[in-house]
Amino acid sequence: MPCIQIIKGIRICVYSNDHVPPHIHAIYGEYEALIDIRELNIITGNLPSNKRKIATAYVEENQEDLLETFYELNPNIQRI
C-alpha cells in the first residue's frame, strides 16, 4: 500500500489489487475513509469533518494523477 502523500496528518494511500470504483484510502489516526477519485464522495468509512474536507480537496486537485496511480497499481481493472 503506497502512501503517496501526507497532508496535515492524513495519509493518502492507493492499494494494489483493490476494487472499483477508483479510490484512495484517507487515513487519519483511528479513522479511515475510501474516497471515490471521480465522484469525490466517501464510499465507506469516516473522517473528522475538517480532515474529510482536506482529503477531498487533495483528491480533487490531483484527480488525474491519482487515477493514473490507481490504474497502474491495479492493472486488472479496466479503465472507465
List where the protein language model places each region:
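C-terminal structural segments of small proteins and small subunits
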Residues: 53-80
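Generic secretory/membrane-interface signal
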Residues: 2, 17, 30, 56, ...
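Short, charged/polar N-terminal "headpieces" of proteins
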Residues: 1-20
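N-terminus-biased detector of the onset of the functional/mature region
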Residues: 1, 44-56, 80
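A short, structured beta-strand/loop element
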Residues: 15-47
